[in-house]
Amino acid sequence: MADKSEMKKLLLTPVLGNNPIALQVLGVCSALAVTSQMKTAFVMTLAVTAVTAFSNLFISLIRNQIPNSVRIIAQMAVIASLVIVVDQVLKAYAYDISKQLSVFVGLIITNCIVMGRAEAYAMKSAPLPSFLDGIGNGLGYGAVLLTVATVREILGSGTWFGIELLPLVNNGGWYVPNGLLLLPPSAFFIIGLIIWGVRTKDPKQVEAKD
């Protein structure tokens, strides 16, 4: 059983320290595609967190019964099943957002964060720590997604969660939206700035020169 300090570490380290996007540079593709609006970024965060947490939990529960030779296949089967469940829940209760997310919910199965935590942590750890590790990494992923989405939606549309913050010129206001920030390449540059900022703050994360 994990003690409180270990549980806190499992939840907070991926968010504040070893962030899966900012430091490990994993899961970047979906971060580029679903961050033009806060709503889609938030729902994607919930989806990835749920899949990562529960896949870690279930894989940890059956880890001693999985033959080593087929462990990757078993992990993918668990993850794929959870992705299908999440996709169906979104279609049932948040159909409009599900349409906006399009194929990217289904592509959670290919997200390196989900597979990486299953292989590196859940296969070697007890169920509760594995579950918390999944939540922590999902929240770390979401922290970057929501940061990028905040910048893109406010500067690109003048809104945040659909609420107008910057009055647009078209509506008699003063702000001229930057359409470039609504395009996926803008997310690439914002994530690059986040990675640069994190590694500047923590020089230990900078790769050693050859």
Swiss-Prot record:
This is Na(+)-translocating NADH-quinone reductase subunit D. The gene is nqrD. It comes from Aeromonas hydrophila subsp. hydrophila (strain ATCC 7966 / DSM 30187 / BCRC 13018 / CCUG 14551 / JCM 1027 / KCTC 2358 / NCIMB 9240 / NCTC 8049). Belongs to the NqrDE/RnfAE family. The chain crosses the membrane at residues 42-62, 72-92, 103-123, 131-151, 178-198. Its EC number is 7.2.1.1. GO terms for cellular component: plasma membrane. It holds the Pfam family Rnf-Nqr. It catalyses: a ubiquinone + n Na(+)(in) + NADH + H(+) = a ubiquinol + n Na(+)(out) + NAD(+). It is a multi-pass membrane protein.
